[in-house]
Amino acid sequence: MKVLFVVNNFYAKGNGLSGSARRTVRKLKEAGLDVRVLSGANPDPNGPEPEFQLQDYRIPFFDRLVRKQGYSFSKAETDIITEAVKWADIIHIEEPFAIQMAACRIAKKLGKPLVGTYHLHPENLFASVGLEKSRIFNGFTMRMWQHMVFDKCEVVQCPTENVKERLERHHFKAELRVISNGLVREDLLTRRDKESAMKIGHGKYNIITIGRYSNEKDLKTLLNAMKYSKHADDIQLIFCGRGPQKKKLRHLAAVLVSKGIIKIPPIFGFYSLDELQKISLAVDLYIHCAFIEVEGLSCMEAIQIGIVPIIAEGKHTATSQFALSEMSKFKERDSKDLAEKIDYWLDHPQERKVEAKKYVGMGEKYNIDNSIKQIIQIYEDVLARHEKAAK
């Protein structure tokens, strides 16, 4: 079976979508499928390149912002896309942008079947410019994605039930199957097997959050929660990540320190996976504030070593599915509610210890090997339908 993955930049770092695509392709190859990638060039000149390579495309005025988000776009070069589609038995669409629209159009013309994965909400795009609440922009974008990409697919993979329900409300024509993007089991075990925790900072309590410094991750809500927490003086906040809002977050943190709201300056840093594993083993709580999140597996990666999370709950974020109690959820963008939940868990250390044990190994439920079996089943089902229709 020859499968073509279509993604703007398969090799982008600090981009959850590209990372998910790389894991999926690797596992599909291990399962014996012939998988090739249609993508832009690898930003690492010494790294591997896609089998079908597209030129880089820079968006006027917005290119700097796009790249700060760990993202990049490729040119929809018809000749290369046609060559790639002709090679494949089935085309797997990973995004709903220009190269995917072109691939869908060409695949339909050549009679090649399409499947897709829904990785992004329109709000993910517009949150960067403060338009995540705009019904006009988000509604138009969703209709365009649906008409030009997803309705041309026979099956669309929905990483969560939350996503499936949204697509059903928009009357997507494709069959919708809920399949997690999945986590690599070996990586999960490695995280739990670390013997030496690495404590950084000087707080009585260490609270960590992991993710891009971007608007939709809503990290300012965690900082603002310190205004309402009775434990603020004893809390060391650790922000693991990077992104376009780094200066704004640092400034807000400095203001809180200067006003005496918090005594211990928050730590901002980008850490290797090995460092994240060691830091995570020495924290008391994990906070996930994102109000737009298709799945949020970075949260599960962290908490499955045995950390109690407090996760934002909202209309367009699915991550609160990982919370095992109501005290591990807070209303999105509500810093007071978050502070109350933080104080609750810090006030009840024994209960927190018992609760943390419940999360150990929870990531097994999201083992990517299970996801790969279901994705391969999609391919087989779709190809069988096409063969039957051709008779």
Write out the residue ranges for each language-model feature.
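Conserved donor-binding/catalytic core segment of Leloir-type glycosyltransferases
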Residues: 4, 199-227, 238
